[in-house]
């Protein structure tokens, strides 16, 4: 286990580049967001993107990593299988997993977002998500890259959704990107958050660590989703 940080979070913190932020923070690993066009942020120049679909872009990223003693802990994907372009998203995700394999990156964070899931219900969202993520796994079965669904949003923080997807897909390569703050953000009482974490611990492939400092009298209450997050969020 080792500590890394999101590329976007480093820049949000005011650092002039990802590499500069990593050095100041004493961290040598970064989680990198891959955009829909297969570009990623340069680690040394935030105004520059590297195209991972081209040999030149891939080489440029590898050079930055080697020259600065940095490794990529995971790729991050912002997929949404509720959109009309799910087929194109699967292709993008497959390409990303294959690049991850080529670079020796062991994990890819995938999103639990399914826009409009309310109109098809949780069961419909489970079927839709499972169908698409199965395609990604099957198309990359010659790799050992692990996919971690982040417990994110109004759907992904429902344990019944996550459990049903894992059972429907039944792949050892599919698990959880455990966000330690999101189950709490969703409104689960603190003791329930710990129960959920224990339940899914064997499925964890990757983690996002953050905290919310609700006052003691609110910690065991079932709260509305996202209740006063801006007030109580507590950066670690």
Where are these predicted regions, by residue range?
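Acidic/histidine-rich catalytic cores of soluble enzymes
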Residues: 2, 7, 13, 30, ...
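A short, Lys/Arg-enriched amphipathic alpha-helix followed by its capping loop at the start of a domain
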Residues: 3, 21-27
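The substrate-binding groove and active-site-proximal loops of carbohydrate-active enzymes
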Residues: 9, 46-52, 78-87, 233-236
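Active-site acidic/histidine proton-transfer and metal-coordination neighborhood
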Residues: 16-17, 21-23, 58-74, 81-176, ...
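Glycine-rich, proline-tolerant flexible connector loops at the mouths of alpha/beta enzymes
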Residues: 31-60, 113-118
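Residues that line or immediately flank small-molecule/substrate-binding pockets and catalytic motifs
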Residues: 34, 79, 112, 204, ...
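Flexible, active-site-proximal loop/turn residues at the rims of small-molecule/cofactor binding pockets
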Residues: 36, 81, 114, 190, ...
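Short coil/turn segments at secondary-structure junctions
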Residues: 45, 80, 84, 116-121, ...
């Amino acid at each position: 286990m080792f500590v890394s940080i999101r590329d976007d979070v480093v820049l949000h913190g005011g650092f002039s580049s990802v590499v500069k932020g990593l050095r100041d923070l004493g961290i040598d690993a970064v989680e990198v967001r891959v955009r829909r066009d297969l570009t990623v942020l340069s680690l040394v120049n935030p105004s520059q993107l590297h195209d991972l679909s081209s040999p030149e872009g891939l080489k440029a990223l590898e050079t930055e990593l080697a020259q600065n003693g940095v490794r990529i802990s995971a790729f991050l994907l912002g997929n949404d299988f509720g959109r009309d372009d799910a087929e194109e998203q699967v292709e993008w995700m497959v390409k990303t997993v294959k690049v991850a394999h080529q670079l020796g990156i062991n994990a890819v964070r995938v999103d639990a977002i399914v826009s409009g899931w309310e109109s098809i219900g949780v069961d419909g969202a489970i079927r839709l998500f499972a169908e698409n993520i199965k395609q990604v796994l099957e198309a990359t079965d010659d790799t050992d890259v692990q996919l971690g669904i982040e417990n994110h949003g109004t759907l992904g923080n429902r344990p019944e959704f996550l459990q049903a997807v894992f059972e429907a897909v039944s792949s050892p390569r599919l698990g959880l990107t455990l966000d330690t703050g999101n189950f709490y953000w969703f409104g689960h009482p603190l003791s329930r958050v710990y129960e959920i974490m224990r339940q899914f611990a064997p499925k964890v492939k990757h983690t996002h660590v953050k905290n919310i400092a609700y006052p003691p009298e609110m910690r065991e209450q079932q709260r509305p989703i996202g209740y006063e997050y801006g007030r109580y969020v507590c950066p670690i």
